Structure formats: structure tokens, C-alpha cells
Amino acid sequence: MLMKRIKYIFVLMIGVLLLSGCGKNYKPITYTKFIENFNDSEKFYVTDDTLKYESIFERFIEVNGLNSEFTYMEFKTESEAKKYVKTNYKNNSYYKYKTSGNSIVITSNQNKYVYGVQVDKIFVIGQTPNKKYKSEVNKNMSKLGF
């Protein structure tokens, strides 16, 4: 009887741990923090293309590296950001699209690796044309808080 109760408590604890990772709430990142993350490294070249896209975005920053690239898009409103992500990623079978807490997360593992997160009016996407550099994308997205 005691062993059954211990097993039950153990299984319950494992279940709680597994479920606690679901629905993660990300925090929006500022463009200055985004730029600082990549300015520290000589591997990346940062370009602020906001003026080129000012009719669509509040901020548009691209970071290009040897093996990966990252884009920071700050929309004028959260609804514009969600619409952009849904239009470009939700109905495309190439991407996995899921809502997680207060954000939308997209990934793809076909041919190239893509990892993007939309929080509030911010959408950040990292990608690499070669899946063997997936860890570089994940490492930098993790540094950004995703």
C-alpha cells in the first residue's frame, strides 16, 4: 500500500514537471537588446533597414552571419504582427505553428532550419540554410530569451 502511494506521488510529480513547461510566456525583446546580442560577436553583421520598411514596421533589423541570419520585426500593433505570422506561416505545411502562452512559435526542419517567436508586436526569426547549424540558431535565440 505504501509503495503504491509512493509511486502515485512520484508519477504525479513527473506529470506536474512535464506540464509546467507548456504554455511558456515569453517577454518581448527590445531592438537595442537584439542588436547588443550580435554586436558583441565578430561573426555577425547588423543592418538596420527600418527606413526601407517604415510603412510596415516600427523597426526592421537584420543580422547576417556566416551560417545563420536573424531578423527583428517590430510592428505598429500586435494584431499586425499576428496577422503577418499567420499569413506567412500558419497555413504553410513547411512550418510547424503553435500558440504557446502569450506567443506564437514557428519552426521548420525541412531543408533549412527556422525558429521564430512572435510576442506582442515583436516577431524575431532565426534561420539557417543548412540544418547542421541548427544549434547556432537555437543558442542565439536562447540568448535573446526565446
Regions found by a protein language model. Give the residues of each.
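Bacterial N-terminal signal peptides that target proteins for export
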Residues: L2-F10
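Bacterial signal peptide processing site
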Residues: G23-N25
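Short, solvent-exposed recognition patches
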Residues: T32-S108
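C-terminal motif of bacterial Sec signal peptides marking the signal peptidase cleavage site
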Residues: L18-G21
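A short, solvent-exposed beta-edge/loop patch
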Residues: K96-F146
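Alpha-helical context
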Residues: F10, F57-I61, Y113
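Alpha-helical hydrophobic membrane-insertion segments
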Residues: L12-G15
